[in-house]
């Protein structure tokens, strides 16, 4: 059994996770036209992978009744997409062109990033709504106790 702040804590982990996701999406959009990063490599699209906090596998939960009600979400990793090919543009006058005159641009699609940004923003808002609902229920419980 959790304490009275469990709902708020779970919502807070969701807000933190979505804020990080928004930061990564912003980095992707900011680097859409970059040909080189600080290390001299072409920027690659990044995405966030989430996992449940205090994850217990299904088989473990069958063997041991944990009573795990969930603790929220956390960032498992920030994934760099090396599968999607880079955009190759012929521009021999560009300072970053290779010996064949091609410039490589990040594998970032602005439309996809904007769609992901809307999704992350709405997920953040949903967590804020759940947080406020939990807070309001606690305030009502305090009023009842008066």
Spell out what each predicted region is:
Residues 1-146:
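Amphipathic alpha-helical polymerization modules
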